[in-house]
Regions:
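Transmembrane beta-strand segments of outer-membrane beta-barrel domains in Gram-negative
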Residues: 199, 338, 355, 408-609
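Outer-membrane beta-barrel pore domains and translocons
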Residues: 230, 254, 301, 332-334, ...
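Outer-membrane beta-barrel initiation region
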Residues: 239-242, 247-436, 513-520, 528-541, ...
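Interaction-mediating elements
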Residues: 2, 22-320, 341, 435
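Outer-membrane beta-barrel "beta-signal"
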Residues: 722-726, 756-770
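Extracytoplasmic gating/loop element in the C-terminal half of outer-membrane beta-barrel translocons
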Residues: 342, 603-683, 687-697
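Extracellular loop and loop/strand-boundary signature of outer-membrane beta-barrel proteins
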Residues: 280, 362, 403-407, 507-513, ...
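C-terminal motif of bacterial Sec signal peptides marking the signal peptidase cleavage site
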Residues: 17-20
Length: 770
């Protein structure tokens, strides 16, 4: 195997050498291939990466920041561009970037301008090149010099009301004496002032009314800065006057607005109207939303001071309603005496409320082929309050192979029905209207029933849930599962199945999962996604991260009631409801992921997660569907799904045995855009699962502080992703690097002694792993 890797390495070196020789194949004589562009600065506060966006001409892209593969693919094409093969290679490849003196000069000028905007007025940029054959390397040497400092800060605001208003808000100002004279910060302050005034009635204000005067003293690096807030002027020729605050006057609803027709109010197709709590509502034939739904989603009311933030929140509120397709809010000025007022028109376009969908799919369960079909009906406005009702029927059939003798047939049949209804508000007794407006939650009620008929057993599953979901500041998502009830019932188990598996008593998980059981749980989940693409000094800081936290609790209320009622336990020492024992456990998970953008083609991603589930009280085991597993497309990718752990347990072919109560996961991934819609990845994964208690059928699986770190599995591999805009198809191939199931050096470290048939795992998935 070592020789194989040596041959592979030698072959790769030869290919790269040949590719480098042909890199200039299509570079004309007298021209140069732009091979590299580097920026160097002498100021630690100015990172070269922050100036990269001002470079007008960049070299051909590199895969994983190493190889200009697309250039080499382009150069594989022949000179006859009419041939199909040559066209294809040129389409997926990347034409050589020919060095342009004009573009280099433009880049030099843009970098100089950017430095001066950052406050380095004396900055200079020198450009140099290094030529080797038909390749050229371009260098920009930035000498920043001393930055200009704001020595004094004054305000010239002729409007006394605004002057007093901003004075009260001065602590939040971005401008401070002693700061670097950075044009980007000055512009951010203009926007901050504008946003503040738009939230306080100044409907016609924009940042063009805010300007600056900067005076410098010759021979120094000091700036006397004055911020000017100009008076209002409707037109250039008009006289100036004070900015007016606007108040909301009338609010009108138009519920059948057609975006393809004129938005002039007198041209709209309106047949009828009504008034609700003083709000006129105009509609065409029939009002499809309850009037209260319209008024409850407003964040402003007649008599309120105009607030742009409330307007945007109103857009968001109506955008959540599935009964609506578009929302447009218009304001018309209405001067009443000395008071400036705004008449508001909330124009709504309804969506298609009813739909039917049919799905047909093929199934493959461990090599057993089958088919499934489903039909669903959806109503997005069930009670005229934008409630979304869904009901879905599903059926599946599969032929099971590999069964031993003693079973009546080998057919697997499944029928299922699920239904749910979502309300676009927080439904709970005694909750105030103010709370409902503040927390724009969705309430969901759901019911599911599933019937499974297999040769080994007949199983039915029923569940019900009540949950809330809402978004906070567009970054945070909350979910509360107020109650989830799941009931598993097995009215028939074949005698052969009992004899072969259940009655042997060796597998506690197996026995537990083929008993009638009840799970009553509640939970909470928190998801935070930072905003990538924030603008700092005119550079895109697209580093982003996410945090996910889940907590779940089951059986505690029932256990307390059982003890209080002094209910007698069954023969297994468990409390039961109608003869069915219920699960009791606590489960918590934490997950962190971060993405670091290197450039527009390359990024680095990191992920770490931990989870623990603890059975107690009325249960000795976590329900199988609540346990953890390791391996697979979103875990340690050197192992197939549910093929790793727990601990150093090597597995016995029974997936039930390869589950645990504790999970650790960590991954790093280098992602690179390849060509067209394809992306590549190089990854390293680490992790495993463990049990809390020691079980005979899972030797080496229990978690122990003095050895768990020795049982961390490690994998490495390559990935190919196809970005289809709406979703990503992912193909990952992983190799085992450290295998905790073995103690001998040769098998414990397969990275040193690799064996493809033993150590490779292929995965297909949709979306990124983290």
């Amino acid at each position: 195997m070592r020789k194989g890797f040596l041959y592979l390495f030698t072959f790769a070196v030869i290919i790269l050498s040949l590719a480098s020789c042909t890199a200039t194949k299509y570079v004309p004589d007298g021209s140069y291939l732009l091979d590299e562009v580097k920026i160097h600065t002498d100021q630690k506060n100015v990172r070269p990466s922050s100036l990269r966006m001002y470079v007008r001409q960049n070299p051909n892209a590199k895969w994983f920041s190493l190889i200009k593969t697309q250039l080499y693919v382009y150069n594989l094409s022949g000179r006859d561009s009419t041939k199909w093969g040559n066209k294809f290679l040129r389409r997926i490849g990347d034409a050589p970037v020919i060095y342009s003196e004009t573009e280099a000069q433009r880049s030099q000028d843009e970098i100089t301008k950017a430095m001066r905007n950052m406050g380095y007025m004396a900055a200079t940029v020198k450009r140099s090149t290094k030529i080797k054959k038909k390749k050229i390397k371009l260098y920009y040497e930035v000498t920043a010099g001393d930055p200009y400092i704001v020595n004094s800060l004054k305000y010239d605001i002729r409007d006394p009301k605004i002057a007093d208003f901003l004075k009260q808000d001065s602590a939040k100002s971005l401008l401070k004496e002693g700061m670097i004279f950075d044009v980007n910060v000055l512009d951010a302050e203009r926007q901050r002032i504008t946003d503040k005034l738009l939230r306080n009635g100044y409907y016609k204000f924009n940042k063009d009314y805010v300007g600056y005067t900067a005076d410098t003293v010759r021979g120094t690096y000091q700036v006397d800065l004055t911020l000017h807030l100009h008076a209002y002027r409707a037109h250039v020729s008009d006289s100036v006057k004070a900015h007016q605050q606007y108040w909301i006057n009338k609010i009108n609803f138009i519920t059948d607005y057609d975006v393809l027709q004129s938005s002039a109010l007198n041209s709209m197709d309106i047949n009828d109207s009504l008034h609700f709590k003083g709000y006129p509502i105009y509609y065409k034939d029939k009002l499809y939303l309850r009037p209260k739904m319209l008024t409850d989603n407003l964040r402003f009311a007649p008599g309120d001071l105009f607030n742009e933030q409330d307007v945007q929140q109103t857009y968001s509120n109506f955008g959540r309603l599935s009964a609506l397709k578009y929302t447009n809010i218009r304001f018309l000025e209405n001067q009443v005496g000395d008071t400036a007022k705004l008449d508001c028109y909330v124009m709504l376009t309804k969506s298609k409320h009813k739909s039917v969908a049919f799905e047909l799919e093929g199934t493959n369960s461990a090599g057993d082929l089958g088919a499934a079909a489903s039909v669903s009906f959806q109503n997005r406005n069930l009670f005229r309050g934008s409630e979304t009702f869904m009901i879905k029927f599903r059926g599946a059939y599969e032929v099971i192979s590999g069964l031993q003798a003693g079973y009546s047939n080998n057919n697997y049949t499944e029928y299922g029905v699920e239904t749910s209804i979502n309300f676009p508000n927080f439904l709970f007794p005694f909750i105030s209207s103010d709370f409902k407006r503040k927390i724009r939650a969705t309430t969901e009620f759901g019911l599911q029933y599933n019937y499974q008929l297999r040769p080994e057993f007949l199983r039915t599953m029923a569940s019900a849930n009540w949950s809330y979901k809402w978004t906070q500041r567009q970054k945070i998502q909350h979910r509360i599962d107020l109650i989830n009830i799941a009931f598993l019932y097995l009215p028939r188990i074949s005698e052969r199945f009992k004899e072969d598996y259940i009655n042997k008593g060796q597998n506690h998980i197996f026995q537990y999962n083929y008993q009638d059981r009840l799970i009553i749980n509640m939970g909470y989940s928190y998801n935070y996604n930072s905003v990538g693409g924030s603008i700092i000094n005119n550079t895109i800081a697209s580093n982003s991260y996410s945090i996910r936290f889940n907590f779940e609790s089951a059986g505690n209320v029932m256990y307390a009631l059982s003890k209080a009622a002094n209910i007698r336990k069954n023969s297994n020492g468990e409390y039961a409801i109608l003869g069915i024992p219920y699960a009791q456990y606590l489960k918590g998970e934490f997950d962190f992921a971060k993405n670091i953008r290197i450039d527009y083609r390359n990024s680095f991603a990191f992920h770490a997660g931990v989870g623990i589930a603890v059975p107690y009280g009325n249960a000795k085991t976590i329900p199988f569907e609540k346990q953890y597993f390791s391996g697979g497309a979103n875990s340690v990718r050197g192992w197939s799904v549910r093929d790793l752990g727990p601990g150093s347990f090597a597995g016995n072919g029974n997936l039930l045995d390869q589950s645990g109560d504790i999970k650790l996961d960590a991954s790093i991934e280098y992602r690179s855009k390849l060509f067209w819609k394809f992306q590549g990845a190089v990854f390293i994964d680490a992790g495993n699962i463990w049990t809390i208690r020691s079980y005979a059928n899972q030797p080496g699986g229990v978690f122990k502080f003095d050895r768990f770190y020795k049982q961390i599995a490690v994998a490495y591999g390559l990935g190919l992703r196809l970005d289809l805009d709406f979703f990503i198809l992912r193909f990952d191939g992983g190799m085992k690097a450290v295998n905790p199931a073995y103690e001998t050096r040769k098998e414990h470290f397969p990275i040193i002694h690799p064996k493809f048939s033993r150590d490779f795992a292929f995965h297909f998935a949709v979306g990124y792993p983290f």
